[in-house]
């Protein structure tokens, strides 16, 4: 096979891969009522892990949370993830929220949004509570 043809195929594959992931953050206001989103994190071996999680939007900022999970370890280690929502897939940074006051605000927002489901899920959370802010 001529090298130009193999280069052409590689270019097409690369273009397809890059076109499927947007690099700007979604309109968070459109996700405020979403019950779940999909987080794609990168495993230590380079593989991908797909996890369905809850999301809250506060003051035009989106947050996800976890405790004692592999996907949370991946996100904390890498500082980034891909977020899959009905509008598409987005490559984002995930900043761990360190402010206790901000964590409590986010936890309260989860409790308000998800109600007794959040209370019940809380019974099965183990390990450090981690809240991540999603940013471009």
Where are these regions (language model features)?
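Short, structured beta-strand-loop surface elements
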Residues: 68-136
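Boundary at the C-terminal end of the N-terminal hydrophobic targeting segment
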Residues: 22-26
């Amino acid at each position: 096979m001529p090298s130009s043809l193999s280069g052409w195929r590689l270019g097409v594959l690369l273009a397809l891969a890059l076109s499927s992931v947007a690099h700007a953050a979604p309109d968070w206001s459109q996700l405020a009522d979403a019950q779940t989103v999909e987080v794609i994190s990168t495993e230590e071996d380079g593989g991908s892990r797909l996890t369905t999680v809850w999301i809250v939007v506060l003051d035009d900022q989106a947050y996800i949370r976890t405790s004692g999970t592999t996907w949370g370890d991946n996100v904390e280690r890498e500082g980034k993830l891909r977020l899959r929502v009905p509008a598409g897939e987005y490559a984002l940074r995930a900043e761990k929220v360190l402010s206790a006051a901000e964590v409590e605000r986010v936890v309260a927002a989860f409790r308000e949004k998800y109600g007794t489901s959040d209370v019940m899920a809380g019974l099965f959370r183990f390990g450090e509570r981690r809240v991540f802010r999603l940013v471009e």
